[in-house]
Amino acid sequence: MEKKEKKAAVEKKKTAESKSSGITPKDVTVCKATEQMLDKAKRDGVETAFDRAANMKACPIGADSACCKHCSMGPCRLNAKDPYAKVGVCGATIDTIQARNFARMVASGAAAHTDHGMGMLDVFREVVHGKIKDYKIKDTVKLEQVAQSVGIETQDRSVEDIAKDLYEELERTYTQVEGEVPFVSRVPEKTLETWRKLGIVPRGAMREIMEIMHRTHIGVDQHYENITKQCSRTALSDGWGGSMVATEISDILFGTPTPVQADVNMGCLKEDYVNVIVHGHEPNMFESMLASVNDPALIEAAKEAGAKGINLTGMCCSGAEVLSRHGVPHAGNFMSTEAVLITGAVDAMAVDVQCIKQGLASVAKCYNSYLFTTNPRCHIEGAEHIELVEHEPKKCTDEVVVKAIARFKNRTAQVEIPNISNAGIHGFS
């Protein structure tokens, strides 16, 4: 019991320090809506990322990347102020250590985009072979353009045949171990010549990520220039591989965006509607959610619960995508995701992968809002998991909406929505 009391006292002290840190919401954001919600959070006693940043001193060794923990002989701590005074137990210099640390960051970032692109390509394959009925190829012009850019014949051929060939060609982006990724055909000639001269043309995304991780292991690559060279190759496998595949397949499946007028900021939330937010990175979940919120049966259920209807908004990456593609209002970016929950108006937030703070779970709990994870790659402690199965995606998104309606009916949080929305023209592609 004594330990619990001490822990509670420490937490109380931390909260007090946070409130008296002297940093105001105006100091940390230029977004007036976020500023208003951070003020509300202070009144409500709710901690956000901004509070933690203000009260957490950054690790000075980590800031200089002067620590290596890649093997069991360490961790080894070097002095960035006198970088060459000593080396790690294995003899690694600070140049090697910093290059290795940076390389692993590159590998992680490239893996995130590559895995996302590979996931989109998997969905494309299942659609092309008729195994997923909820999605279909919406932009056949884009399909032909992309196919032609990688040398696939399109004249007098069916959409299905072109799509099957395109899938097989783009799959090489990930699985190939020699040669060059397909979209290298788009690289300007002089640029490609330079890449080839430097030996940094990506062979395949998985090959480059695997190799860079191998090189950063103890006893492998121990020259910062050579490690950095592989960083470039891995980064290019992302930009001209995983990311580009994800972009093109998304447009082919769900339609290439065209200019559309839509509102952004938290003013797009509506107090008298069931508010559902989708946040993450993968457009397929959002496309299914669009079908769910427009389902007449679910709209009627929302009205029976006392709402005027269902209001869908997006946040962050996938939110920006459907903002451009469908004109769905966008409530904010990564740093606004906690703030939007503080409005008390969010009945459910459904997330998939990337840019999702673990802190959302505790903020959602404070305002009796639902936070749902939907992807097997991303579970969050404190959030409810409803898995989206690609062959029946609406089953997941329908359940999210049903639970959002139930939360609307039993709202307990005080609602405060910033009266701020900004009109804009989006969808340039």
Language-model segments: residues:
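Metallocofactor- and cofactor-centric catalytic cores in central/energy metabolism, strongly enriched
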Residues: E2-S429
